[in-house]
């Protein structure tokens, strides 16, 4: 079965009886889409046993696709071809690059960022692009303290995991999808 944001909003919630299902967000970053800033994506994630195992995040404005699958790897596909992805090792001596939501900044988030070891740079982006920049090795940490929906995170989560990264709850446990 597939669960999509728009179908849930319309009251159509499929029964998840097996261990595998799709999470789809055909327009992640609605605020960014309305602002016409290009920071919106199409997200498709496959979840098995509560964990994203494959994902695709597509940014129509730049015709860029990030894909990843457990045990296979992660890639960015754009006009320059295919690039294999790997998260970078955070260098706390040089300072972390933090990427956070452009639309969901809060005093709690700012306090969290202020308490990180050493922040060299803070970037704001919309939608699942934050996951993609982590997988691309352009950022180290994406803190998200405000509520979010599973269709917003599953695809990007799969890409980050396939690139060698982790997605965790604020207490350090793996983020699970139920």
Walk through the language-model features, giving the residues of each.
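Structural motif
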Residues: 1, 20-22, 54-55, 97, ...
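Flexible, acidic active-site loops/lids enriched in D/E/S/T/G that coordinate Mg2+ and/or position polar
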Residues: 1-49, 56
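Short gly/ser/thr-rich secondary-structure transition/capping motifs
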Residues: 2-7, 81, 172-173
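Conserved beta-strand termini and adjacent loop/short-helix elements that scaffold enzyme active sites
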Residues: 5, 101, 124-125, 144, ...
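Residue-level structural signal for beta-strand termini and adjacent loop
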Residues: 8, 37, 58, 71, ...
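Acidic beta-strand-loop-alpha-helix segment within the catalytic core
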Residues: 44-132
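Oxyanion/phosphate-interacting regions
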Residues: 110-116, 131-178
